[in-house]
Amino acid sequence: RSRTEFADVIAEYKTENTEIGIDVSKWQGDIDFDALKSAGVEFVIIRVGTADGIDGEYLLDSKFKQNIEGANKAGIPVGIYFYSYANSKDRAIADAKWILKQIEGYQVDLPIAFDWENWSFYNEFNLSFFGLTDMANSFLSVVEDAGYEGMLYSSKTYLENIWLNTDYPVWLAHYTSKTNYAGAFSYWQLCNNGRVSGINGDVDINIRYLATE
């Protein structure tokens, strides 16, 4: 199975208008954030948690505190993502409020991402495309009202076919060397087989596009 070296991504994609980073969760185990910083990691998007299925209780990612403390201490800018099982606007709002509680007291300068991938439940939820977008927008507006940036995480296929134009920044997942996604996006997750000093095993590598004046 092929690997994508972080240094190669820097060599290919780093410009004055991009930053190269990663996203992490408990699956990456114990991370050496100083090593990440030395390797040129410019940001890290940390999984805060998920829910135990539909209407389930919230589950804090078991490495969340360790990861956000490590990143804050190493001076690596932090974003957040949450894997949501929301099936209503109310639940999406509750998700956002739970996240805001978990990140209190930590430095979070980058967006909080709504990651919703429950396509197998989609019909059961009886949601229209409009309802789904409305749900994401509700989550993201709570995050923004609290002073954070919000963004929507999704794969290219679903961004093209399901999510109606959301007014929020997009974190595009498309595992390829050059994306042909035509919409606007602020972050691009380009692989899930990344390798970087400080992490044992695979990690997702991302590019952040800085707003050009």
Predicted features and spans:
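Functionally critical loop-and-helix segments that line ligand-binding/catalytic clefts
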Residues: 3-29, 165-213
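Substrate-binding cleft of extracellular glycoside hydrolase catalytic domains
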Residues: 14-138, 144-146
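Short, solvent-exposed loop/turn segments at secondary-structure junctions
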Residues: 51, 119, 157-159, 177-178, ...
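Hydrophobic anchor at the start of a short beta-strand
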Residues: 78, 149-150, 170
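Short beta-strand/turn micro-motifs composed of small residues
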Residues: 82, 154, 174
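Structural recognition of alpha->loop->beta junctions
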Residues: 100-114, 118, 162-184
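Aromatic-lined carbohydrate-recognition surfaces of secreted/lumenal glycan-active proteins
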Residues: 143-160
